């Protein structure tokens, strides 16, 4: 009895000294002081629950605060009555166990003891996982902070699946987890599903800590989501711990990125690493001589690249354009680069079979050309770490897979100016098929471009899929005379779904369209591999995702005019285009206004690229709203 208390007190002193050395509070936090200056909401009687002891972090009142170290271990000498009571409780616990629950208040997913501090201390000393407690939940008075919103999401999760152990640090994660398990946050989960999640999480947590997860800046629940995103088809309960640990080691860099702040997760690479003028086409000595001595690849040992398309190129204009870019590589690099394509790989089994075939054929690089293939691509990249994987998307923070996409907002800015110069009544239609990463920046750039030529211009925004031929009719009903569709039509059934058009007397006339030059994009990425500058893009000491985000200045984005466009109009747009290419014009520089007010005032520099990618507002001359999102990850607009 005395020896146990002395050991516990020693741990308490160690915890107290450690806290002081780290400029932290050395004693228990008391809830009364914590919430004294905070707006508080109602209290709810949660009832009798088994709660995780690691989440019991303090006491309700200040009275017993200094009797315990911040780790809940005792600090008072053994000669005190406090020590004798602690020791008696220790004896009861190791001989027969406690029968009475402690009384706690839950606040922001942590527990503070009102009655039973010494019992909690004893159980923590014995490394017990849980304690029986009567719980009263204290809600925050406001929900406008990230922390309170996260707690609100936890409460919604807890009502349908009462597990305290599951704690996320990123908004939307509880709904993501629910969807992975075929559930939601509205209907109560079957008890079998709750038990399954509890056992699965505890198994994963043991493996995660065994792999060294306590050194990472993410919760075990966050790490489990990352794991399931890669190995989502495997039941954790059926997987030996050694295999789970080995898999965690394979995705370690993904876990490191998951623990970073959003602004530290992704490196946006906006300029090619190889000088644009230094191209084989401009070398008088030919392609082979141009790369002689600059690369380890040759016609005898080519750089082998596989392209995996989501749909058949014959029916998907998006995949067809990417495949034209692939063919351009074969022609452009004169045998130093050899490619092969795999089509219609939207099914996971077909995708993984394509990867296996590409690996057998000696592929050094694999491109997957749709954001919807990222999940499969990530798992393949983890399984084949020596192969370089890239996915056509933007803003997705994966270290194992690099992303690439274009600054389509630059082209939309020009199309907006062009639309305003030709609109009859200040009303311009804009149709977006999906709410995606980059979609709002494209809408806003279009609206800003239109406002430069016509301050009274209104952008009539619509969303969603429209039947073939129906977009023009829908826009006519809105009273617009000029309209634009998506960046890329999925098929040729409805030409008005793509590009900028005039609507006059029921007739649709093309004006201009955005252009993707995927051949040029792939050329720039491949040149970084041939020249050996691929690894210069990222710092191995700084684990970050790499997203290529090239625009007009790199030649990967442009616009194409319809025949017969007045030369004065072309000249105007060309002036704006030159400004974008040279960097003297940026749609998101200077004064900006949203539907809710001023975004930034005159004289401010352009918005950072990360804010453009993750834009969450609409310009003040847009008539429309942002759709309500479910928890599906945002994807680039196609």
Question: How should each PLM-predicted stretch be described?
Answer:
Residues 1-118, 124-125, 170-183, 190, ...:
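Short, charged/polar connector segments at secondary-structure boundaries
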Residues 326, 414-457, 540-563:
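An alpha-beta-alpha
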Residues 382-405:
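Flexible loop/hinge segments that line or gate small-molecule binding clefts
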Residues 305-324, 329, 342-348, 436-440:
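Extracytoplasmic "Venus flytrap"
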Residues 404-426, 515-536:
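Hydrophobic alpha-helical segments within soluble ligand-binding/sensing domains
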Residues 531-537, 541-638:
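Segments of small-molecule ligand-sensing domains
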Residues 362-371, 390-392, 480-489, 508-516, ...:
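Periplasmic-binding protein-like
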Residues 107, 114-177:
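Glycine- and acidic-residue-rich phosphate-binding/metal-coordinating active-site segment common to enzymes
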């Amino acid at each position: 009895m005395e020896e146990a208390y002395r050991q516990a007190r020693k741990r308490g002193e160690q915890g107290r000294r450690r806290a002081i050395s780290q400029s932290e509070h050395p004693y228990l936090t008391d809830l009364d002081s914590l919430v004294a200056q905070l707006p508080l909401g109602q209290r709810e009687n949660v009832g009798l629950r088994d709660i995780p002891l690691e989440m019991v972090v303090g006491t309700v009142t200040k009275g017993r605060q200094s009797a315990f170290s911040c780790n809940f271990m005792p600090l008072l000498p053994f000669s005190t009555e406090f020590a004798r009571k602690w020791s008696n409780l220790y004896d009861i616990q190791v001989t027969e166990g406690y029968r009475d629950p402690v009384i706690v208040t839950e606040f922001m997913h942590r527990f503070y003891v009102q009655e039973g501090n010494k019992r909690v201390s004893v159980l923590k000393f014995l490394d017990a996982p849980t304690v029986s407690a009567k719980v009263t939940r204290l809600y925050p008075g406001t929900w406008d902070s990230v922390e309170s919103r996260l707690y609100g999401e936890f409460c919604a999760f807890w009502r349908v699946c009462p597990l305290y152990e599951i704690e996320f640090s990123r908004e939307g994660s509880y709904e993501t987890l629910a969807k992975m398990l075929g559930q939601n946050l509205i209907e109560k989960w079957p008890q079998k599903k709750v038990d399954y999640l509890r056992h699965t999480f505890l198994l994963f947590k043991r493996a995660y800590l065994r792999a060294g997860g306590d050194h990472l800046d993410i919760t075990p629940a966050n790490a489990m989501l990352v794991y399931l995103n890669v190995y989502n088809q495997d039941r954790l309960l059926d997987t030996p711990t050694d295999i789970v640990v080995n898999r965690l080691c394979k995705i370690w860099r993904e876990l490191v990125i998951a623990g970073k702040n959003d602004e530290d997760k992704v490196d946006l690479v906006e300029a090619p690493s190889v000088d644009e003028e230094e191209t084989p086409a401009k070398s008088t000595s030919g392609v082979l001589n141009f790369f002689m001595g600059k690369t380890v690849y040759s016609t005898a040992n080519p750089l082998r690249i596989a392209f995996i398309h989501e749909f058949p190129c014959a029916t998907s204009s998006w995949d067809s354009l990417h495949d034209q870019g692939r063919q351009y590589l074969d022609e452009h690099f004169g045998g130093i680069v050899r490619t092969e394509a795999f089509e219609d790989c939207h099914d996971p089994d077909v995708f993984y079979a394509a990867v296996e075939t590409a690996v057998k054929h000696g592929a050094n690089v694999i491109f997957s050309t749709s954001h919807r293939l990222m999940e499969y691509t990530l798992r393949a990249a983890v399984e084949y770490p020596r192969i370089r994987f890239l996915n056509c998307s933007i803003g997705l923070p994966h270290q194992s897979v690099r992303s690439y996409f274009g600054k389509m907002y630059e082209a939309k800015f020009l199309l907006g100016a062009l639309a305003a110069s030709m609109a009859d009544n200040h009303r311009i239609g804009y149709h977006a098929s999906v709410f995606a990463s980059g979609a709002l920046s494209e809408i806003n750039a279009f609206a800003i471009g239109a406002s430069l030529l016509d301050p009274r211009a209104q952008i009539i925004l619509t969303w969603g899929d429209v039947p073939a031929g129906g977009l023009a009719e829908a826009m006519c009903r809105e009273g617009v005379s000029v309209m634009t569709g998506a960046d890329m039509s999925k098929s040729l059934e409805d030409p008005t779904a793509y590009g900028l058009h005039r609507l006059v007397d029921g007739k649709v006339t093309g004006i201009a369209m955005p252009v993707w030059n995927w051949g040029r994009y792939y050329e720039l990425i491949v040149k970084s591999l041939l020249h050996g500058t691929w690894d210069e893009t990222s710092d191995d000491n700084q684990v970050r995702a790499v997203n290529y985000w090239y625009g007009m200045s790199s030649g990967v984005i442009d616009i194409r005019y319809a025949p017969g466009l007045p030369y004065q109009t072309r000249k105007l747009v060309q002036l704006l285009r030159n400004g974008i290419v040279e960097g003297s014009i940026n749609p998101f520089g200077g004064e900006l206004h949203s539907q809710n007010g001023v975004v930034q005032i005159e004289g401010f520099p352009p918005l950072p690229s990360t804010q453009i990618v993750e834009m969450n507002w609409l310009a003040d001359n847009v008539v429309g709203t942002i759709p309500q999102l479910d928890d599906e990850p945002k994807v680039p607009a196609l």
